[in-house]
Amino acid sequence: MATESILITTLPMDLNSQINNVTFGLNENETLCENWREIHHLVFHLANTCFAAGLVIPSTLNLHMILLRGMLCLGCIFFIIWAILFRCALDIMIWNATFLSMNFMHFIYLVYKKRPIKIEKDLKGIYHRMFEPLHVSPELFNRLTGQFCEIKTLAKGQTYAIEDKTSVDDRLSILLKGIMKVSYRGHFLHAISPNAYIDSPEFRSTEMNRGETFQVTITADDNCVFLCWSRERLTYFLESEPFLYEIFKYLIGKDITTKLYSLNDPTLGKKKKLDTQPSLCSQLSVMEMRNSLASTSDNEDGLQTFLRGTSTTSSQRNNQQEFCNAYGVGPLSHAVFC
């Protein structure tokens, strides 16, 4: 108390008067707060209710951002109505009109992002079977299939690739409709069914070494429709999309393994009429393939192990010796299935 009196005494007279005015003003405000004003109109409370409802929407809800922006827009509209009709406050109206325009633009953007994306009718099958289970969005799938690929057809009997002639560097394809058969020097190897890669072994084996040619002949056994990518442009695209690169790596590895298993498992064949054609690999044991694949986590290493393990078996069969020796254990291709 003594310190306070000393400070007041040492201050100039005009400053003392200002302090007294401030003290008087504060005391006056305190007396004014004793009388509360009447409750605002119902529209004011509706606006705040909309804000509160938007903030408590759980983030786990799929459309929570759209609902949040919608509730904020509704709350701003109620505030504008309240400011114009019941308060006649221009500043409140301007601020809420600004907030309304910002939230409404964001609301429109979010609704646009949620629009259903159309996928071509011919491509719906491979999307739902191959890409959708791996969480590839329709938008990303359309980017993958809409820029540097095309849908092509082959009539029955036409060839997709000819051994020792067709380059493997040009394309990568997925069969959409029909069925194809793979053969070597007239000997049937295996069939290619819809929703499967046509040339996945060649694509994997020549990632580092270019300039190779097909070592097998791939022929349309029915009227076929396939999706074809330009290999060079696809490679550049996948370099900029690490997620899709891993998806392709997984799908191609799975496709090669499926082709390998299908050699000795007729139930995996799509057409029974192809099962009647003798395959040079039909006498190999499925257990040999399973054991070789189980011995390693890498598909290519497993295939190479399988090749080494089956080369002895093939040498014991005169009708298979010429075929298996033509490939040996060289680069991975359709020949791994023998």
UniProtKB/Swiss-Prot annotation:
Pfam family, one: POPDC1-3
Swiss-Prot/TrEMBL keywords: cAMP, cAMP-binding, Cell adhesion, Cell junction, Cell membrane, Developmental protein, Glycoprotein, Membrane, Nucleotide-binding, Tight junction, Transmembrane, Transmembrane helix
Keyword Transmembrane: yes
Known glycosylation sites: N21, N29
Any GO MF annotation of the entry: cAMP binding
Disulfide bonds: none
Name this protein carries in UniProt: Popeye domain-containing protein 1
Name of the encoding gene: popdc1
